[in-house]
């Protein structure tokens, strides 16, 4: 689609410096850059056996054209390795398309930062990141359920 390449380049060249600077004002429990293990691979490294994550699929930022590429099976071998590594610990709601699943396993060379923030500070931290031009979204962490991570759509 028109503008997809420009959007991808802008995303890949956005430095994580501002987000890192903002994070110094909050109680951060963990942080990782989302790179070769994809979003779900890195998330799985940040949480332990006592907790799980719940992600609202609508809130996941996706570059224009990425879903279409995945629908056309323009997939990477690394995404398949990531799926093989953590896929059995992820539960996707039945309405999540395969293309979105693939994007969450897809390795990124510059996928931004994933922070674990004290719950009471999460909203303020997110607003500050977004106010600085960031593309922050929230992942809900809860007591461990059946899977490491559930991808779905929260009720609106």
Where in the sequence are the language-model features?
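Helix-biased detector of long, well-ordered alpha-helical tracts
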Residues: 1-156
């Amino acid at each position: 689609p028109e503008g997809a390449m420009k959007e991808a380049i802008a995303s890949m060249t956005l430095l994580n410096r501002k987000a890192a600077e903002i994070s110094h004002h909050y109680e951060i429990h963990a942080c990782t850059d989302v790179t070769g293990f994809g979003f779900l691979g890195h998330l799985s490294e940040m949480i332990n056996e006592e907790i799980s994550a719940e992600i609202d699929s609508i809130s996941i930022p996706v570059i224009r054209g990425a879903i279409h590429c995945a629908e056309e099976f323009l997939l990477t071998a690394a995404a398949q390795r990531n799926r093989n590594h953590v896929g059995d610990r992820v539960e996707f709601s039945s309405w999540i398309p395969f293309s979105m699943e693939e994007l969450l396993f897809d390795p990124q060379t510059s996928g931004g930062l994933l922070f674990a923030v004290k719950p009471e500070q999460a909203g303020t931290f997110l607003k500050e990141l977004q106010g600085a031009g960031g593309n922050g979204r929230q992942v809900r962490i809860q007591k461990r359920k059946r899977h490491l991570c559930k991808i779905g759509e929260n009720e609106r």
